Amino acid sequence: MAGSTELTIPVTRRATARARVPLPTLLLAALAAPLGAQAPPSPQDVLGHALGERFTDHGQVVRYFDALAAASDLVSVERYGQTGEGRPLLQALIASADSRARLDQILALNAELTDPGTSAARAAEIAATNPAVVYLSYGVHGNESSSSEASMWTAWDLARGAEGLEGALEGAVVVIDPALNPDGRDRYVGWYRQARGANPNPRPEAREHWEPWPGGRFNHYLFDLNRDWSWATQPETRARLATWARWNPQVHVDFHEMSFNSTYFFFPAADPINPAYPEHTHEWGRRFGDGNAAAFDARGWPYYTAESFDLFYPGYGDTWPSLVGAIGMTYEQAGSARAGLAVERTDGVLLTLRDRAQHHRVAGHATIMTAVNGRGELLEGFARFHRDTGADAGDVLLVPGADPSRAAELVGMLQEQGVQVEVAGRAFEANAGAHNGFSARRSFPAGTYRVRARQPRGRLATTLLEPETELNATYSYDVSAWSLPYAFGVEAHTVRGAPAADWTAAPGSTRLMGSVAAGGWTGSGASLARPAFAGESRSFVASSESGPDAPAASASSVGYLVAPGMGAWRGVARLLAAGGRAIALDEGFDAAGRSWPAGTFWIPAYANDDLDGRLASAGLTGAATPVATGSTVNGNDLGTEESYDLSLPRIGLLAGEGVSPTSLGAHWFFLERTLGVPFDQVPADGLGAGALAPYDVLIVPSVTGSGRRTLDGAGDALGAWVRAGGTLVAVSGGASALAELAEVERVQDEEDDDEEEDEGDDDDLEDALLGREARELERWEQSVPGTIFELSLDPAHPLAFGAGVSSAGDGDADKLFVLHSGDLAFMPDEEFESAAYFPAELAELSGVISEENLESLEQRAWLVSRRMGAGKVILFADDPLFRHFWFGAFQPYANAVLLGPAY
């Protein structure tokens, strides 16, 4: 509170940081309550304004929860992580004195309910006395801003025993996460405070209702955190999932906002609904909906259910919790970024921030009380969910293959979500069905991973690993496919029974994705100090023939060989940044007792002083194989001219208005936190010859209409820069916008020509007479909503180095699995190279696509490289970094950025 004296309060066990509360607030509270019975402070007491009068930034939210914990024995606050910008992530536990006294026992019994081996009788015994765990998550989209306001209101209500919550804490312990995305929230709140006048303007045309790019929806790295639950790429998600097994909630609510002209949405969900959910999940979705409806009806508030917001894609804040046993639900309040503090709807109703927070508050109350009133049934159903896990599903075997780092990365992603993984201590045989092949008796090597279907996170594991998830509707809110073995390029099989193979728990796997610690690179240029990496003592292992036991280089060694892969690229980038030298060999060969693929890195001794020290600093020691001679058994010798002398390119990444925020964020995060290379974000509105001159590589993420116009306007400058030696790498919408510059014809250009020739066809009349549902289905199918395909790869092309995998273990590493969305593909031409393309007789592996779109993709290019003067343009039909989880597509992208200037 401005002008007030503040008192620093020592924090007790109920809060993990120091809380600053205005002195007048404390004095008034102390006078109003007898010693030892201090009334919990309201948000207004601590913040100095009533909820809804102004936006509360995250620092103020933290201050309120700390003050509440300091004043109430029922509330404790824990910092469970921090955001990309260093803001704390909070979990507030609100529980009765009795529940607090036996909290460890409550949570242990709750965890026992997740064990598939817990009997129905034992579950009933636990359910008779244990409270339910209700987890309320607010503000995963930072500009859906009423959520965090409602979190404070709800916490205060629980702490003071507000009317309507009688008995709530006897039947439940409540966990409140007041802001899942503090960085996005403060981006929005900070802008709004600057944009509004002395009083809020409710006219929707006013500036304060038009949030600028990139918006507060996203986190620091511009990721949509409500798509990240199942991939755990972002620090906020990873920190939250690390706490999940402590709580194992029976109920999880994800509070959102939608169009300010809408009403309020709560469950039951719309179709499609993931088939992994048992009737327990559906039944309780309806029961919570009934409870919310009664609360809203009593107040005359409008709402709707089951019309939108499905429960299919596993990365949502309702779907993922539901896959691990909670009744996960999305609640959507009218409002969002355009609502501000007050907005006039098209029906003339004035919608205020306080209204929006109040609706979330009441929905939260109703949800808690529905859980409390049905506590016993809820807990027994929770136990049954886990007891029946794996009843109809087989276990999944993951084969490490030629590049074990792929399987290790996949295992790390699963383990981070609490999935148990085992590893075979010896080779074995089993009857197994290949995910993209047929069933047969097969041999599997030692080191094969097994993911059991019957385990606490079994339904989640099955959903993430199965080759295709059944879609029970004609439309999905998001992508229609995601199978992780395809995403990582890992051979996968389904097996029933338990083949003997000396199975043990797989060791924890350090993920490559996002593991570069923040605070390293500060700009472009190879002279900068390298960034700090998490787990520096651990070298990655790139192939089964190399590892930490590989012999040290002898005095006569000519250097080291490193097989291509993502871990190799990161290590080589470190080496180059530190002044070392590496060479990429253009063809495969045999040396040092094994075969090496095209794209293998040679780290020559003659060009690297203190070679072993350089390898250790780059994290390459465990992956490097020493070679004592430059001669090879088969193929070119190491000194061949068929090679590429590498240097770390100066990289620019297009950013700003017109660039897709999430696409930009994926590239930013990949370059900074996964690959660990320096780069500059280049303002889109300043493209020109001068702006491009400092760079060897310019990356163009997906763009919107205004971004396309920006690129069109900069066409001459971009063309001149490429012809002078620049490498232009563009993906998805950015590639579509730059195809004309590269003189690459898009498939849709050909189709547009065909449509002009067919204008007036009878089919147009039939299309015009389609019913509404048929139109919606056709529109969705035409969009290609995230469908998995197997592409043919040119393994000799530099863009394909290290990227190819075999199909169903056939041994030929000439395939690439991609998640294709939209209608972009390129017409092959002799004037440029097609490094990856859709084959003839194309069929989707997983997901939805119309027959017409399927045929239009056959024998069309997905990844092309076009030489222009001394430079080149590289175009990807999709964004290979989409949501930063399609690991198999990272390699061709890294090749484009780091090898592109050299080949």
Where are these regions (language model features)?
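Bacterial N-terminal signal peptides
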Residues: 22-34
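Intrinsic-disorder/low-complexity accessory segments
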Residues: 38-145, 149-173, 221, 227, ...
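Short, conserved secondary-structure transition motifs
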Residues: 169-188, 785
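N-terminal secretory signal peptides that target proteins for export/translocation
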Residues: 1-20
